[in-house]
């Protein structure tokens, strides 16, 4: 039997929109997603998916449920089959128990009761309360995150409320000595940070001591409820803001999270004293947010940022790294009133790929030609994880970092790596915080292809042999007007007069090939979400992959 805690963890981790959109075409509508119901015939969309709450409901036929129930209904699977299918898809390990089904309601209730005892103790301990306030925490924040304190009086509270001590030992609240088998408080004399599941249930604690010789932070031990390698501190309060802002700030400490929330950055979370791992990714990816790593600039912080960036870059996640130098961290900046400076820094992260390449270069003695050669091989090996377009974007950066001739990297034109900044803002520290310039936008590419066709309409016969108007997302009307020879169309005239569309002799075929490539790359994303039968999806995906391979080898492929 699959443990209930394992089922809960799966439901809390997976994104219901990602699950359902692989079966049904969803469109955003306010805070929800809508579609025509897959469980009954209808013409107008009445099937609603709530990403934040993790459920779907059809206002037409009444079908409703969570991700598991949807997969069961759509694929006609049993409960266990649907669970195992989702776990396999999202790389989540299910735990099985051969014994009787076990409900964790009592465990959650016990931890909530203990958390309440800790909270009461903190407000009866002026010294510890003053410490937190001196660190910049307001009373409202202390209450919102339900901070507490573990003192000897907690023993009395446990006895007085008749809480199950054996259970509390299992849950890591109490320990038992090896010698006399007496119980003791594991978090004695520590400020307590309750740690919640994504569904806002207490699953464990982090404890901070003010004593110098003891370990500064300790967490609850691993249990059926508490897995520090997959939990994120503050996520239960941040998740709605993450979905709305499409951005998540990952920090290193509990206090960083609380102070960031207090300063208005309510999309901040933290790992539980561990590095970011693949086990965190399913939860971190929910809602497809931009991921900002906000780490200390010391050696440990740089190493953690490097390992996380390697993982996130290979996962093709949007976002980047912000390192805080001179022993600063977000908590310090907020406490010092530097909120605007912090906001500016968070607006200009260094992209994951760029950060990795710079760290790789820094790890070699580049005055030594042999070391430089090793660095080049490592950096190019890393770039092989990405598309040819991305590789071409970052090769000039490698040449700059290694002071290597451009032709060594296969670069013919005299180009250099150009970080991109939004036109509305100018960062204070461009040498550290940069967005990498992306490949030409699809809209620009569509304009360029149509401009070539306007300048030389004999190319139109070539073009229509390979493409149709469905290739264009932004300039479909202009292409249709051109095919219908409506050359006085104002939009076509505007393109003809656009001075920002550089044409090169013999360049049309290259741009046409790139436009077709973009089309098939979109198909790879859209086909799995279509309503086609599984066998047809596989055929279409295979065709798209073959086309992409030929296009990258320089062939033109008809759509």
Curated annotation (Swiss-Prot):
Keyword set, alphabetical order: DNA replication, DNA-binding, DNA-directed RNA polymerase, Magnesium, Metal-binding, Nucleotidyltransferase, Primosome, Transcription, Transferase, Zinc, Zinc-finger
Reactions performed catalytically: ssDNA + n NTP = ssDNA/pppN(pN)n-1 hybrid + (n-1) diphosphate
EC main group: transferase
One GO CC term on file: primosome complex
Stretches that traverse the bilayer: none
Cofactor note: Binds 1 zinc ion per monomer. Binds two Mg(2+) per subunit.
Record Gene3D superfamilies: 3.40.1360.10, DNA primase, catalytic core, N-terminal domain (3.90.980.10), DNAb Helicase, Chain A (1.10.860.10), Zinc finger, CHC2-type domain (3.90.580.10)
GO molecular function, one term: DNA binding
Biological role stated in the UniProt entry: RNA polymerase that catalyzes the synthesis of short RNA molecules used as primers for DNA polymerase during DNA replication. Stimulates the 5'-3' DNA helicase activity of DnaB.
Record-linked HAMAP family: DNA_primase_DnaG (MF_00974)
NCBIfam families for this protein: dnaG
Name of protein: DNA primase
Organism the protein comes from: Helicobacter pylori (strain ATCC 700392 / 26695) (Campylobacter pylori)
Annotated gene: dnaG
């Amino acid at each position: 039997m699959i443990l209930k805690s394992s089922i809960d963890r799966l439901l809390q981790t997976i994104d219901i929109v990602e699950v359902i959109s692989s079966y049904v075409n969803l469109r955003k509508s306010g805070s929800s997603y809508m579609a025509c119901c897959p469980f009954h015939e209808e013409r107008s969309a009445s099937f609603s998916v709530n990403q934040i709450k993790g459920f779907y409901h059809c206002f037409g036929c009444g079908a409703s449920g969570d991700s598991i129930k949807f997969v069961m209904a759509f694929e006609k699977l049993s409960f266990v089959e649907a669970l195992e299918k989702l776990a396999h898809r999202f790389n989540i390990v299910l735990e099985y128990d051969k014994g009787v089904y076990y409900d964790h309601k009592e465990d959650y209730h016990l931890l909530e009761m203990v958390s309440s005892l800790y909270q009461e103790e903190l407000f009866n301990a002026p010294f510890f309360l003053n410490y937190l306030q001196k660190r910049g925490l307001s009373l409202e924040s202390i209450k919102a995150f339900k901070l507490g304190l573990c003192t000897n009086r907690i023993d009395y509270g446990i006895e007085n409320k008749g809480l199950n001590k054996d259970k509390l030992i299992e849950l890591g609240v109490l320990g038992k000595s090896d010698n006399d088998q007496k119980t003791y408080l594991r978090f004695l004399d520590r400020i307590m940070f309750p740690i919640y599941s994504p569904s806002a249930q207490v699953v464990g604690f982090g404890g901070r001591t003010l004593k110098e010789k003891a370990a500064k932070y300790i967490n609850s031990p691993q249990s059926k409820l508490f897995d520090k390698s997959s939990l994120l501190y503050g996520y239960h309060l941040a998740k709605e803001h993450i979905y709305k802002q499409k951005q998540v700030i990952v920090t290193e400490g509990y206090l960083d999270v609380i102070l960031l929330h207090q300063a208005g950055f309510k999309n901040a979370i933290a790992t539980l004293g561990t590095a970011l791992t693949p086990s965190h990714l399913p939860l971190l990816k929910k809602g497809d947010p931009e991921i900002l790593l906000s780490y200390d600039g010391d050696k440990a912080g740089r190493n953690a940022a490097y390992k996380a960036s390697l993982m996130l870059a290979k996962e093709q996640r949007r976002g980047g790294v912000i390192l805080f130098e001179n022993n600063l961290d977000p908590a310090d900046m907020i406490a010092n009133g530097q909120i605007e400076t912090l906001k500016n820094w968070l607006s200009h992260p260094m992209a994951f790929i760029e950060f990795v390449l710079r760290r790789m270069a820094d790890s070699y003695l580049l005055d030594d030609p042999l070391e430089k050669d090793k660095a080049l091989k490592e950096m190019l090996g890393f770039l092989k994880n990405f598309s040819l377009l991305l590789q071409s974007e970052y090769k000039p950066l490698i040449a700059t970092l290694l002071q290597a001739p451009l032709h060594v990297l296969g670069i013919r034109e005299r180009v250099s790596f150009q970080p991109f900044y939004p036109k509305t803002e100018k960062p204070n520290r461009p040498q550290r915080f940069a967005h990498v310039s992306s490949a030409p936008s699809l809209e620009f590419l569509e304009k360029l292809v149509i401009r070539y066709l306007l300048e030389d309409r004999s190319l139109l016969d070539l073009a229509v042999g390979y493409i149709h108007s469905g290739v264009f997302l932004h300039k479909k009307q202009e292409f249709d007007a051109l095919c219908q020879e409506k050359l006085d169309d104002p939009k076509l005239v505007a393109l003809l007069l656009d001075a920002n569309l550089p044409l090169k002799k013999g360049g049309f075929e290259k741009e046409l090939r790139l436009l077709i490539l973009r089309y098939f790359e979109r198909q790879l994303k859209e086909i799995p979400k279509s309503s086609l039968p599984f066998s047809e999806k596989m055929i279409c995906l295979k065709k798209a992959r073959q086309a992409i391979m030929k296009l990258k080898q320089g062939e033109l492929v008809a759509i």
